[in-house]
């Protein structure tokens, strides 16, 4: 009986925090305004997509590679609340003809779930790459053995498309490592990845077991996870790590046990052997120097403070710049209002998105910034190609493009 009472109390506490989180805009939103910054000379286009594009990287000046990840659908079953997620995919966006194509995964095991998120490339030659993909592999047949997998594909560039051939997999138990958030390929054998350990539901069931009671929660941004994440953040229970993995030796090394709670996006500067790791809650970017002799080892050498929340970053070796998609809630707007209070025609806004460009050769100064009311909510990635800036979101369908007028 005491256990049941404890469960009920925990449930009410998490619901209370979730209610405050979801309604904080109502409490604070009337006091703050945000003007759209640096978009007067740009026009935007929203390209419809089948599913949300959770992550995006640049292959070259012609192609973007995107991971399509379906949001969980939440159902009630005879035993507990559970999720079911349809398979996602890898999409190729052709910048020249504005075509978005779902790429076939050659030789990929048909029975293996595919829920891709983070992406990273290693260049073999001008036409051939290894593509590494985070796969949140939810096993509906054996739900207590959910795995986080990193899939390795051989990517070959063709005239108007690419081919992806499945090679092999590195898997991690969710029970011990939590969720893999981002990856960066150092060479063809060494990868770095960030993880986040947090509360998660013990089981997943198929749609055949649905009761329809919680259908209104579909695509609710990991609704149950949000409840527990809020509680864990309040008591500093969430932990994040940075690891390296040697694909050939099968060895894992802990590089950083974060003092904060949000090790997220990774990007690698191969020329200078620098690894960038963003932490949205702490609002900074950690810079590690990768050992040239032992690339599975890294040393923290610098920290850059950021103004906004950043989920993922991309290092553009052609321009020696870092691109970041930014997002924010009502809590960020105090600083924004103070910064832009002299602007005219402020519009009320509850959330915002945007883009930041860091110029590495000028000591990581911000060389371009865009802020806008969310035409696309929950920005997870942003990349600049020539005069166009591309935005993706893991929560909302669509590819948003800002172009010079």
Regions found by a protein language model. Give the residues of each.
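A short helix->beta-strand "capping" segment at the edge of beta-propeller domains
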Residues: 26-52, 102-104, 163-167, 364-371
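Beta-strand-rich domains and repeat architectures in extracellular enzymes and scaffolds
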Residues: 43-88, 377-378, 395
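Beta-rich, blade/repeat-based domains predominating
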Residues: 50-59, 86-87, 108-123, 171-190, ...
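Short, conserved, GDST-rich strand-edge loop motifs in beta-rich repeat architectures
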Residues: 66-85, 133-146, 193-236, 325-350
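Short loop/turn segments that connect beta-strands within beta-propeller blades
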Residues: 94-98, 155-162, 246-250, 289-294, ...
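Asp-box/WD-like beta-propeller blade repeats and closely related beta-sheet repeat scaffolds
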Residues: 104-124, 128-187, 194-229
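Loop/turn-rich, solvent-exposed surfaces of beta-rich toroidal or solenoidal domains
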Residues: 307-372
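Blade-level signature of beta-propeller repeat domains, shared across WD40, Kelch, NHL, RCC1
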Residues: 378-405
């Amino acid at each position: 009986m005491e256990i049941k009472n404890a469960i009920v109390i925990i449930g009410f506490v998490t619901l209370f925090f979730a209610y405050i989180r979801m309604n904080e805009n109502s409490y604070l939103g009337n006091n703050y305004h945000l003007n759209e910054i640096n978009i007067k000379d740009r026009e935007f286009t929203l390209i419809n997509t089948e599913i949300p594009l959770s992550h995006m990287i640049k292959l070259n000046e012609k192609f973007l590679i995107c991971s399509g990840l379906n949001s969980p659908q939440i159902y009630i079953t005879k035993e507990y609340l559970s999720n079911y997620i349809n398979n996602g995919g890898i999409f190729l966006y052709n910048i020249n003809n504005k075509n978005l194509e779902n790429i076939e995964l050659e030789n990929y095991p048909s029975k293996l779930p595919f829920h891709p998120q983070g992406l990273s490339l290693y260049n073999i030659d001008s036409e051939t790459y290894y593509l590494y993909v985070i796969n949140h592999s939810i096993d509906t047949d054996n739900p207590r053995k959910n795995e986080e997998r990193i899939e390795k594909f051989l990517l070959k560039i063709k005239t108007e498309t690419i081919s992806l051939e499945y090679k092999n997999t590195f898997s991690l138990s969710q029970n011990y490592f939590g969720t893999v958030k981002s990856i960066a390929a150092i060479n063809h054998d060494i990868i770095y990845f960030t993880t986040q350990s947090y509360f998660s539901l013990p089981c997943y069931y198929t749609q055949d077991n649905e009761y329809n009671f919680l259908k209104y929660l579909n695509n609710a941004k990991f609704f149950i996870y949000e409840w527990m994440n809020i509680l864990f953040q309040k008591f500093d229970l969430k932990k994040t790590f940075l690891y390296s993995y040697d694909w050939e030796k099968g060895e894992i090394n802990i590089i950083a046990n974060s003092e904060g709670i949000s090790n997220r996006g990774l990007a690698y500067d191969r020329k200078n052997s620098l690894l960038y790791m963003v932490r949205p809650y702490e609002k900074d970017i950690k810079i590690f120097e990768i050992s040239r002799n032992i690339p599975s080892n890294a040393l923290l050498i610098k920290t850059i403070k950021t103004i906004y929340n950043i989920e993922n970053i991309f290092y553009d070796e052609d321009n020696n710049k870092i691109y970041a998609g930014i997002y924010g809630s009502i809590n960020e707007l105090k600083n924004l209002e103070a910064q832009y209070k002299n602007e005219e025609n402020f519009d009320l806004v509850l959330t915002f998105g945007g883009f930041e460009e860091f110029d590495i050769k000028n000591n990581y100064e911000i060389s371009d910034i865009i802020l806008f009311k969310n035409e696309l909510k929950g920005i997870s990635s942003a990349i600049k190609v020539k005069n166009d800036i591309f935005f993706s979101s893991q929560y909302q369908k669509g590819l948003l493009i800002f172009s010079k007028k």
